[in-house]
Design a protein with these regions (language model features):
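Hydrophobic alpha-helical transmembrane segments
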Residues: 1-20, 82-85, 89-90, 94, ...
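Helix-to-coil boundary motifs at intracellular loop junctions of multi-pass secondary transporters
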Residues: 69-76, 156-160, 194
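Juxtamembrane intracellular "pre-TM" segments in multi-pass secondary transporters
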Residues: 19-51
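Structural signature of the two symmetry-related core transmembrane helices
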Residues: 4, 110-124, 203-207
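Substrate-agnostic recognition of the 12-TM MFS/MFS-like secondary transporter fold
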Residues: 6, 58-63, 94-95, 99, ...
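Helix-loop junctions at membrane interfaces in 12-TM secondary transporters
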Residues: 126-139
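A single, central transmembrane helix in multi-pass transporters
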Residues: 1, 39-96
């Protein structure tokens, strides 16, 4: 009921919003827009690299891993819904407050350390998974760099994209990001079916950010990022 009421309120505000003065500057046919957008990506490889650098944040879509923890590893401690809720609540603490601490240090030179920090945070969480209450602390480390990494890589993409292609590039970016997140969720289930422990899966996910750090180092040396 509450969700429905919120949707009705939002539609009401949207209906009352006056957008008469906003007119599109660039009008193209859909197929031509798609063709020109893909051509723009082909001619601007930096944009493609920034899209994939942002997609690394999709590794943090470990909801499937949390579900496995709740259903199997911590099943005898608390109810599934309570385990999932507590883990997500603990993670949200760092997602909310860490950006305020890291924003003073975020720039193109320090971004590589944010990738490394994200990887180390997930590995710390992996080491704490043997104990549920320790994992509530460990997941705070896992989420400490996530918001800053997501927002800064998104900002880099915006700053290095031409205005007329901005909407298309953001659409491609979201498509790659969501696809990467779905792939990670599938990989978690697949690795678990192969017999890997949740600790090993989490540690593997953290190590992927070291690949992201190296990838960013190569891109920053090869291209001039604004």
């Amino acid at each position: 009921m509450l969700d429905g009421a919120l949707y009705l309120c939002s539609f009401g505000f949207l209906y009352l919003l006056k957008l008469d003065e906003l007119k599109p500057e660039f009008i193209e046919k859909p197929l031509k827009m798609l063709k020109n957008g893909l051509k723009y990506l082909k001619e601007n490889r930096l944009i493609v690299h920034l899209i994939f650098l942002h997609a690394f944040v999709g590794i943090t879509a470990y909801d499937a891993l949390i579900a496995l923890l709740a259903d199997y590893k911590y099943a005898n401690l608390l109810s599934t819904s309570l385990v999932i809720g507590l883990l997500n609540a603990s993670r949200s603490i760092s997602l909310m407050f860490a950006p305020a601490l890291l924003s003073k240090f975020m720039n193109k030179k320090t971004l590589i350390y944010i990738y490394i920090g994200q990887g180390l945070g997930i590995i710390i969480w992996a080491l704490s998974l043997r104990n549920f209450y320790l994992s509530l602390i460990g997941i705070i480390f896992a989420g400490f760099c996530t918001s800053s990494l997501w927002s800064y890589t998104y900002t880099l993409l915006q700053q290095n994209c031409q205005k007329e292609f901005y909407g298309r590039v953001i659409a491609y970016n979201d498509m790659i990001f969501l696809g990467f997140s779905a792939l990670i969720s599938f990989a978690i289930g697949f690795l678990y079916e192969l017999g890997l422990s949740v600790e090993m899966i989490a540690a593997f996910m953290g190590s992927l950010f070291f690949v992201g750090a190296f990838y960013y180092h190569v891109v920053s040396k090869r291209y001039e990022i604004r």
